[in-house]
């Protein structure tokens, strides 16, 4: 007997199955058992048993799938939820069940007036016998489902109306739909044309239906039908296609119908406005905006809608219906239907109509969907229900049409879109006409219902509707009222009270705390909230809710009573909380949504992670009530301190807005930078901020009674950025232009009136800095203007010189202001302000500072120590400052701990001062700000900002307090040093470059004297580096001033960060500050002229170049007495000159690189003739140059002095800059180590150059011209003074350095790759940068360039020679000398013809230090000198023509490139300066792998890159200009340059990035094999390469190389030729090219350090020192390069030297060369490789240097592959790349030389060694230039646009065009091809400019990756550089760029060793330009002994 399942249990199981399936789960045995047991308590065993039995008897279905059993209800299987199974049961029997009849019966039987629910209908039907009989068999669920389906269908067809959960028969639908529609339409008044429609013309009708494409003969159904045509566009459609009812059609034909595309609102007649919110009348098809309706609608009405024109006038029930409709709309209309808002009448007569007339499908495609569809079931039911009568009819008709026509309408909408405008109109139009016609017809047909009279008709219509309704359910007035009341109550519970807002603000009201606030704007709350009229917000957590009930429930649970963050400020009942968008994301999002309700333009709501929100609250016992907030980006490159600010309406006009603005500036001041609100400001924001700025400035002026006050000082005191101060002063009419100066006019009445008002009406809430407890997240943003940093530096520098300078400063300030004014109003203002500030600083600061100095507080009174100790000290201090922030007390040096501690503190204070100055982004301000700013700022503003900061600085406070609390706190606020660095990047970092030196143990050991000497040395280095760095860093600095400053300072600091000798940092800082304080003028004599020049330069720049020059002369005069030795004086002079150009340019610095300006330091351009041989002078010049960056100091070229001058120039550009630059000048003169820091400082200076170059870009052009005129005057004196100063410095330094020499050599070469090698590099690159500066700004200061170049060259030559000799004598000096030589070289090239005398002088001077220098160095210097002389004589002469052409280009290339170069040089010099850096660079090479000294910069970050690699540093700095953080290309356009720069310099940038990843491996490899090789090519491989023992050799080699490279490195040497001068004008590369003489000179001496290869060409030298180990790798290629170069050096010395400089060969020396000239340019190229200098520069050195290095790199990379890019090889690569960068410069120069043919040919000589490479490079060079798109682009543009490529290549381009004014790039290429074919120069150029190296470097987006890659890449790039030139074109090509990007790692890792890769790049090469020959590249690589792939791959990647 079969056991049957218990039917009860079976039913339970089926219910369980249904329940489980309802939960979207699989009905498994387990789940069924659980469900049954939970509901019926049946045990599992029984359930399973019954389940099995049920399966057997078929009542349950068992499904097995994948081993799992599921159970289903056969009657109700899953997805087929239709009456299938049930049909089997009850409905199946009753297949004939007519659900329509059943439903009708149910509704009639229930007779519920409001409608019946589904449940009641189901209950009613189940109670009917026939139904129960029919459906009894099936489960209840089956019947329920069928019923639901039937009701749904009925609703869809319009038979039923759905109102919420209620259903009701549509009485209208009961009649024929057409009839009812007609009825509703017919009840409407007849349609008539409106007045404005009568006169309008009617378009010619198009006789084709736009929908079915039929004619009037046949429509879609092939029947004849007349068309309706649009009166505006003539498009036609069949009424049936438009879904018009006959009635509507009739009405529409009587009107002027518009299609949906042309439809305009009949009310406002604005066609373009808000088409989406347009409703189409169902009677006339006119369009109306919802807000234009009467009454306005907030939601799309459902059902039929009739416009106010057609609508009958309502009488008796008018009000009721209106309200009901409103409720209906509010409640019933779907939220999503904004368009058709139901109007009360519309509901009544329209609901049905719209369905009838096919409302949904009518012609209004867009609108109809809304309106017709809106008339769909749910809404319609609701609306109609409210209207009563309308409901039934409306629903049914519209519903019908809705479904079918919805798609149609959409389709039609698309169809009817002849014109974009007409689209909506047309659809709408169609609708209207149909409606009208329909209505007419309807009206007639249903006349019985509706009277003709509008009013009567309406009433009767309503009545009839009611009657219709009434047949089933009589709706009485009472029913309606009841319904309304209940509905309103329900709505109230949901929180909706008032009528919808016509303005469609969602929400229109919010309840927030105890306030109900009407919103001003809509906010993107989620849709379900945004449509609500009112939102309820929790005032503590800002959660938004729909109703008060929900809010009350939430408030019981919400435990918040303050924002979810730390309270950073509290005073009385006011608190500020700092909320991190990354931590409290929801809160911040809710805050943004709330803010948007009261802000017009706000786009940030959900992406809050990158922002900090400072929430202002008012506190009471209940909690902290939100008052307002402002948000700021965490890492804002533009230094915006507010991105959004909002005060809730209830707290407005109570001073809270001003409080928040003030608070934001307080935070900025604590960060040590000036801030500015995010631009553009809204109208309200502009008003608020202008009011704030006015009051702050007036109050500041009221409290500052100094006769002189600068914008910079104002900026420092207020935290307001100089641009805003300038615009405000201009607005207050307190800025005037008088006698070539911008002067701040104290309008005492205005000030007094303001203060009187203020006293009468005290501010209700004021920010009390004492109540702030906050530490900046980032000490200093890299965004801080370089100008600011420089200004800060200058401010400090100026302080010491105080009185001396006061007058000059004032004049300068005026000038500076004028120049700055050109830069920007703020800049000008700053200058003016600076005058008083300088004075004040001079007096008050000076007094207190000097006292402090005497108390061994040099930092603050940096001027006193400026001489030699000062700068160095300052650097030390600054570095220490960096450390200071990290370990201010801990790192006091053991040697002079107390002294240094004080110094450190002082430096911290001074740094803070600088920071403060930096904070005031105005360039001039920085100058004046220096000291005066600090006193004033300290006392007034410092009270607020600095107090807090002072608290932060423990030790610093001690000494800084006396100096100025402002500054100290600033420093600390900024993370003390970091901020400082960041802020006064130019100033501090310029000083910082000394830090490496300072850091070097020797300097530390000799606190005062040594400090002085090393400081001088550092100074030189600084200059070199500054020069170099300036070019590179300048660009970076503008955008990433803070970061740059930090990293570069860190570079130096971090170079010592490994902190070889924290003391040195302290020492440097101390000394610098001592310089300021202890040696107000005595020491200033060295730096004084620079500093003064800086001050003057800033002022002069601002005012005018003439004035600047005069003031510079004054400075010189001032300095001259102060200057100790002639060389020192010359240094200062040159610095002054340099500074002047810089000064003019620095103003731009703030903004970033000017478009047209070169990124090189201006002085680069200025000292084109400088020979690398004059390293000492060049060192000084480098400092000058870098300082001079703004001021193209061709004359400054004499040595690094231009760097100092550059610093000064920068200073002149900004008063603050002047001060900063002065420090720089001192620092630079003081220490090449500072030049290391100048990698950082270079950043700063570069910033200065940026400021100078950038500012000058626009601003300096006039002032620069003036400068040019005056400069020559000043320059000679400067040159003379500088060389003397340099000589003395060098001798002193050499004394010290000789002691330090070994250390320094190792350290500098290693640690400071930027040290010695870098120094050489720096010199050369910096010289180049200087030269390029000169070149860069030639346009602006062409005359100046020429005259100045000559003077500068003479001075630079003397200095360069002195420096070179000095360098040779001491490795450390050597580095610095090399660096200086580089600048000299550049300057020489540029100044060659002008400065041959100078060269001779410099040579002589060089000889003086020569005895002290190493033999190698001596040889190198000699060779450099010879080369320089020969080049000057031949190449430079040759280049003179080019120079003329170049100068034109120079004006705009100069600025851009000069600053970069300058910066790079700064970096190099600084790196060179630090003996410790040098040595420790091996261990710390990881950090500063390529340029160990630079590496600290690397450690620092980008800065590290620059400083670490003296030479690399320059390029690094160049990149740094872009991005102080070398790894942060994004920081600035130049960030690419940063990478490039770093890479170029010594692979340091790569090393830097790589160092980040694998510093040790990078360093060690670089240090040992690459270092050895790179020693000579140190310029490129300085940091990491020559980091190790080869450093000394490196130093020598570098010195030689540097000397040689001084002229653009080996390559640049060739380039160094006069064409290079042109190049100088064009770009750092150009400058580098000008260095060729130096390069060529060194080639003979270089051989001593390196093998013959190196002697031949500097490139080889570079490669040679390294080649010893990797020489086979590198040497073969370098020999080709260098061998060709030797010939070119001689050859090129005259011809190639300037432009071609043996670009191909230059590639080998490119390390040095690049660092100095290529360094900035090329490093820039590398860092800004994409379009700047990376490719070109890199290309060539890549070939030589890269070959050796590349081989090593290949070995390392192939082997140490595991290392993060095998830093060593990477370094090699980098070094090579750097070399290449220089080479690129050289090559670029050759392009130019090509223009000036001799060089090109000279370059062609190198082909023997470089032949394939050279040729390749040449072609690629050309290609690169072309591919770089730099060819036709203006240099500045190119530079800016292609940053990476632009810097160098662009510069080169400029160079190239010099000879031929054609597109620089193109010319370069064009010219280059002949010479380039053989010469690496052109190739390098090609690579550099068009080189995708830059691009690839950049494309390898991550700096680190690039860096790492870059190392390899650089190694490869070393190759690649040359190859890159070839590659450059291919790189330019997108495909190749990709390759470069994709290869970098690959190449570095495996490909490096594999030739396949090389060939691959060759293959891509075609992509770039055919010129690049893969094979050539290949051979090049082979020559190098490095895998071609290495070169090719990396390069190609680039």
Curated annotation (Swiss-Prot):
The modification Phosphotyrosine is found at residue 900. Residues 1-77 form the SAMD1-like winged helix (WH) domain. The keyword RNA-binding does not apply. Residues 1639-1658, 1665-1693 have a biased composition (Pro residues). There is a cross-link at residue 835 (Glycyl lysine isopeptide (Lys-Gly) (interchain with G-Cter in SUMO2)). Keywords: Acetylation, Activator, Acyltransferase, Chromatin regulator, Isopeptide bond, Metal-binding, Nucleus, Phosphoprotein, Repeat, Repressor, Transcription, Transcription regulation, Transferase, Ubl conjugation, Zinc, Zinc-finger. The modification Phosphothreonine is found at residue 369. Residues 312-662 are annotated as: Interaction with RUNX1-1. One of its GO terms (biological process) is nucleosome assembly. Residues 1030-1041, 1472-1496, 1527-1541 have a biased composition (Low complexity). This is Histone acetyltransferase KAT6A. It comes from Rattus norvegicus. The lineage of its organism: Eukaryota, Metazoa, Chordata, Craniata, Vertebrata.
């Amino acid at each position: 007997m079969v056991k049957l399942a218990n039917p009860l249990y079976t039913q339970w199981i089926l219910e369980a199955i249904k329940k489980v399936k309802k939960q979207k789960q699989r009905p498994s045995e387990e789940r069924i058992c659980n469900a049954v047991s939970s509901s019926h308590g049946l045990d599992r065993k029984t359930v399973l048993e019954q389940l099995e039995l049920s399966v057997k008897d078929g009542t349950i279905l068992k499904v097995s799938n994948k081993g799992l059993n599921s159970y289903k209800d056969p009657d109700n299987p899953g997805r087929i939820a239709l009456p299938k199974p049930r049909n089997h049961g009850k409905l199946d029997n009753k297949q004939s069940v007519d659900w329509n009849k059943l439903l009708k019966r149910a509704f009639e039987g229930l007779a519920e007036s409001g409608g019946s629910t589904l449940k009641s209908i189901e209950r009613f039907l189940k109670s009917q016998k026939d139904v129960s009989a029919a459906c009894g068999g099936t489960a209840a669920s089956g019947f329920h489902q069928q019923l639901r389906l039937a009701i749904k269908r009925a609703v869809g067809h319009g038979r039923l109306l759905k109102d919420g959960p209620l259903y009701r028969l549509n009485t209208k639908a009961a009649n024929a739909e057409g009839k009812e529609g007609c009825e509703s339409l017919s009840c409407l008044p007849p349609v008539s044309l409106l007045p404005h429609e009568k006169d309008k013309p009617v378009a010619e009708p198009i006789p084709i239906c736009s929908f079915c494409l039929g004619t009037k003969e046949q429509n879609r159904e092939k029947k004849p039908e007349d068309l309706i045509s649009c009166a505006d566009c003539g498009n036609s459609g069949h009424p049936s296609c438009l879904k018009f009812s006959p009635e509507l059609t009739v009405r529409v034909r009587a009107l002027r119908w518009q299609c949906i595309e042309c439809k305009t609102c009949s009310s406002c007649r604005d066609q373009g406005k808000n088409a989406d919110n347009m409703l189409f009348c169902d009677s006339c098809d006119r369009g109306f905006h919802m807000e234009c309706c009467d009454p306005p609608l907030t939601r799309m009405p459902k059902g039929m809608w009739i416009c106010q024109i057609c609508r009958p006038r309502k009488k008796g029930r008018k009000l009721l219906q209106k309200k009901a409709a409103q409720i209906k709309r509010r409640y019933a209309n779907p939220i999503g239907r904004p368009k058709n808002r139901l109007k009360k009448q519309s509901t009544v007569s329209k609901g049905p109509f719209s369905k009838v007339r096919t409302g949904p499908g009518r012609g209004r495609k867009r609108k109809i969907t809304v309106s017709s569809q809106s008339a769909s079931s749910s809404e319609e039911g609701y609306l109609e229900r409210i209207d009563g009568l309308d409901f039934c009819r409306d629903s049914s008709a519209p519903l019908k049409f809705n479904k079918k026509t919805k798609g149609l309408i959409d389709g039609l909408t698309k169809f009817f879109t002849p014109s974009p405008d007409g689209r909506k109109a047309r659809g709408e139009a169609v609708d209207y006409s149909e409606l009208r016609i329909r209505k007419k017809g309807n009206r007639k047909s249903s006349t019985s219902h509706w009277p003709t009279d509008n009013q009567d008709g309406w009433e009767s219509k309503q009545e009839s509707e009611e009657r219709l309704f009434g047949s089933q359910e009589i709706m009485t007035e009472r029913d309606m009222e009841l319904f309304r009341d209940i509905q309103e109550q329900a709505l109230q519970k949901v929180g909706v009270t008032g009528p919808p807002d016509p303005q469609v603000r969602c929400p229109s009201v919010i309840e927030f705390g105890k306030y109900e606030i009407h919103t001003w704007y809509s906010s993107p709350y989620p849709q379900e909230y945004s449509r609500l009229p009112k939102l309820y917000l929790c005032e503590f957590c800002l959660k938004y809710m729909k109703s008060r009930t929900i809010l009350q429930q939430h408030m019981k649970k919400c435990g918040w009573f303050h924002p979810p963050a730390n309270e950073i400020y509290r005073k009385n009942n006011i608190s500020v909380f700092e909320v991190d968008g990354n931590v409290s994301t929801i809160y911040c999002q809710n805050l943004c949504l709330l803010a948007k309700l009261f802000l017009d333009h706000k786009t940030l709501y959900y992406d809050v992670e990158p922002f900090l929100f400072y929430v202002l609250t008012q506190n009471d016992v209940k909690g902290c009530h939100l008052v307002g907030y402002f948000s700021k980006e965490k890492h804002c490159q533009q230094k915006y301190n507010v991105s959004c600010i909002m005060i809730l309406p209830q707290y407005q006009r109570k001073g809270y807005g001003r409080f928040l603005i003030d608070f934001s500036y307080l935070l900025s001041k604590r960060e040590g930078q000036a801030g500015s609100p995010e631009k553009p400001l809204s109208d309200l924001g502009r008003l608020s901020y202008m009011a704030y700025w006015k009051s702050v400035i007036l109050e500041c002026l009221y409290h500052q009674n100094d006769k002189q006050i600068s914008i910079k000082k104002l900026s420092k005191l207020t935290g307001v950025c100089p641009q805003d101060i300038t615009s405000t002063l201009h607005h207050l009419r307190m800025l005037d232009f008088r006698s070539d100066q911008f002067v701040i006019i104290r309008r005492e009445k205005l000030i007094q009136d303001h203060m009187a008002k203020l006293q009468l009406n005290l501010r209700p809430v004021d920010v009390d800095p004492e109540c702030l407890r906050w530490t900046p997240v980032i000490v200093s943003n890299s965004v801080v203007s370089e100008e600011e940093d420089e200004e800060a530096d200058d401010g400090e520098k100026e302080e010491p010189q105080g009185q001396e300078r006061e007058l000059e400063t004032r004049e300068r300030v005026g000038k500076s202001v004028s120049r700055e004014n050109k830069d920007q109003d703020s800049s000008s203002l700053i200058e003016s302000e600076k005058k008083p500030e300088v004075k004040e600083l001079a007096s008050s600061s000076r007094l207190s500072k000097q006292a402090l100095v005497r108390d061994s507080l040099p930092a603050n009174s940096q001027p006193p120590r400026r001489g030699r100790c000062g700068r160095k000290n300052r650097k030390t201090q600054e570095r220490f400052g960096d450390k200071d922030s990290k370990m201010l007390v801990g790192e006091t040096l053991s040697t002079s701990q107390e002294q240094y501690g004080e110094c450190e503190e002082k430096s911290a204070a001074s740094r803070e001062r600088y920071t403060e100055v930096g904070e005031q982004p105005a360039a001039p301000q920085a100058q004046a700000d220096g000291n005066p700013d600090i006193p004033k700022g300290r006392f007034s503003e410092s009270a607020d900002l600095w107090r807090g900061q002072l608290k932060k600085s423990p030790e610093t406070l001690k000494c800084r307090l006396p100096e100025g609390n402002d500054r100290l706190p600033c420093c600390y606020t900024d993370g003390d040093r970091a901020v400082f660095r960041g802020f006064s990047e130019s100033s501090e970092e310029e000083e910082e470059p000394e830090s490496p030196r300072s850091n070097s143990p020797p300097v530390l050991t000799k606190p005062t004297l040594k400090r002085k000497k090393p400081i001088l040395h550092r100074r030189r280095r600084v200059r070199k580096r500054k020069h170099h760095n300036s070019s590179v860093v300048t660009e970076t600095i503008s955008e990433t001033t803070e970061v740059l400053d930090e990293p570069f300072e860190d570079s130096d600091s971090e170079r010592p960060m490994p902190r070889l000798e924290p003391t040195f940092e302290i020492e440097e800082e101390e000394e610098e500050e001592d310089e300021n304080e202890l040696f107000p003028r005595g020491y200033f004599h060295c730096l004084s002229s620079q500093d003064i020049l800086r001050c003057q330069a800033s002022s002069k720049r601002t005012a005018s170049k003439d004035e600047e020059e005069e003031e510079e002369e004054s400075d010189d005069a001032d300095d001259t007495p102060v200057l100790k030795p002639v060389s020192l004086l010359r240094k200062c002079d040159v610095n002054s000159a340099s500074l002047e150009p810089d000064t003019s340019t620095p103003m731009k610095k703030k903004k970033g690189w000017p478009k047209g300006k070169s990124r090189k330091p201006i002085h680069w351009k200025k000292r084109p003739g400088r020979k690398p041989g004059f390293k000492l002078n060049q060192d000084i010049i480098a400092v000058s140059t870098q300082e001079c960056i703004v001021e193209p100091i061709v004359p400054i070229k004499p040595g690094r002095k231009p760097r100092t001058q550059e610093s000064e120039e920068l200073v002149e550009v900004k008063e603050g800059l002047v001060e900063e630059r002065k420090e720089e000048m001192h620092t630079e003169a003081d220490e090449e180590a500072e030049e290391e820091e100048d990698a950082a400082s270079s950043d700063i200076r570069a910033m200065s150059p940026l400021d100078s170059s950038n500012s000058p870009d626009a601003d300096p052009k006039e002032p620069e011209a003036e400068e040019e005129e005056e400069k020559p005057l000043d320059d000679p004196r400067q040159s003379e003074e500088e060389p003397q100063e340099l000589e003395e410095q060098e001798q002193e330094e050499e004394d010290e350095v000789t002691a330090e020499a070994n250390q320094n050599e190792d350290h500098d070469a290693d640690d400071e790759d930027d040290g010695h090698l870098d120094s050489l590099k720096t010199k050369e690159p910096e010289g180049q940068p200087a030269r390029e500066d000169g070149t860069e700004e030639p346009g602006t200061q062409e005359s100046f360039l020429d005259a100045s170049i000559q003077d500068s060259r003479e001075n630079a030559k003397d200095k360069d020679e002195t420096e070179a000799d000095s360098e040779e004598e001491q490795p450390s000096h050597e580095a610095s000398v090399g660096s200086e030589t580089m600048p000299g070289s550049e300057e020489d090239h540029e100044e060659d013809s002008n400065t041959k005398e100078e060269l001779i002088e410099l040579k002589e001077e060089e000889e003086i230090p020569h005895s002290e220098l190493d033999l190698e160095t001596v040889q190198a210097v000699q060779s450099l000198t010879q080369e320089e002389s020969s080049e000057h004589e031949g190449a430079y002469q040759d280049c003179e023509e080019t120079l003329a052409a170049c100068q034109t280009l120079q004006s705009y290339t100069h600025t851009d490139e000069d600053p970069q170069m300058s910066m790079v040089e700064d970096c190099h010099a600084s790196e060179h300066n630090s003996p410790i850096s040098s040595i420790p660079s091996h261990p710390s090479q990881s950090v500063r792998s390529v340029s160990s000294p630079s590496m600290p910069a690397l450690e620092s970050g980008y800065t590290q890159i620059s400083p670490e690699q003296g030479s690399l540093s320059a390029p690094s700095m160049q990149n740094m200009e872009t991005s102080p953080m070398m790894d942060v290309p994004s920081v600035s356009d130049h960030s690419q340059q940063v990478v490039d720069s770093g890479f170029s310099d010594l692979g340091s940038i790569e090393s830097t990035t790589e160092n980040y990843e694998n510093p040790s491996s990078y360093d060690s490899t670089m240090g040992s094999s690459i270092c050895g090789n790179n020693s000579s090519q140190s310029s490129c491989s300085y940091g990491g390469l020559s980091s190790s023992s080869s450093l000394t050799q490196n130093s020598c080699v570098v010195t030689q190389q540097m000397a040689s490279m001084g002229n653009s490195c080996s390559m640049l040497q060739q380039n160094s030729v006069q064409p290079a001068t042109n190049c100088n004008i064009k770009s750092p590369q150009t400058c580098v090219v000008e260095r060729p003489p130096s390069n060529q000179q060194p080639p003979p001496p270089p051989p001593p350090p390196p093998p013959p290869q190196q002697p031949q060409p500097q490139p080889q030298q570079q490669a040679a020192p390294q080649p010893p180990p990797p020489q086979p790798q590198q040497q073969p290629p370098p020999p080709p390069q260098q061998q060709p170069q030797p010939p070119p050096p001689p050859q090129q010395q005259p011809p190639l030297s300037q432009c071609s400089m043996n670009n191909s060969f230059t590639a080998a020396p490119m390390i040095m060369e690049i660092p100095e000239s290529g360094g900035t340019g090329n490093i820039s190229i590398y860092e800004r490789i994409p379009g700047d200098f990376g490719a070109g520069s890199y290309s060539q050195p890549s070939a030589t240097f890269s070959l050796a290095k590349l081989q090593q790199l290949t070995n390392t990379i192939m082997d140490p592959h595991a290392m993060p890019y095998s830093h060593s090889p990477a370094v090699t690569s980098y070094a090579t790349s750097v070399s290449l960068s220089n080479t690129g410069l050289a090559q670029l120069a050759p392009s130019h030389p090509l223009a000036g043919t001799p060089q090109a040919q000279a370059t062609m000589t190198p082909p023997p060694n470089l032949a394939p490479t050279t040729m390749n490079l040449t072609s690629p060079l050309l290609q690169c230039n072309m591919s770089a798109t730099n060819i036709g682009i203006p240099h500045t543009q190119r530079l800016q646009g292609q940053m990476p490529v632009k810097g160098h290549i662009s510069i080169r381009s400029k160079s190239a065009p010099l000879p031929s004014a054609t597109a620089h790039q193109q010319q370069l290429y064009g010219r280059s091809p002949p010479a380039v074919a053989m010469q690496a120069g052109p190739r390098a150029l090609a690579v550099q400019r068009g080189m995708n190296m830059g691009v690839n470097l950049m494309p390898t987006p991550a700096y680190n990756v690039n860096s790492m890659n870059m190392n390899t890449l650089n190694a490869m790039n070393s190759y690649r550089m040359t190859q890159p030139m070839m590659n450059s074109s291919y790189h330019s090509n997108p495909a190749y760029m990709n390759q470069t990007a994709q290869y970098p790692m690959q190449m570095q890792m495996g490909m490096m060793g594999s030739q396949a890769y090389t060939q691959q790049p060759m293959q891509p090469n075609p992509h770039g330009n055919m010129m690049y020959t893969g094979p050539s590249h290949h051979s090049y690589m082979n020559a190098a002994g490095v895998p071609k792939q290495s070169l090719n791959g990396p390069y190609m990647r680039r």
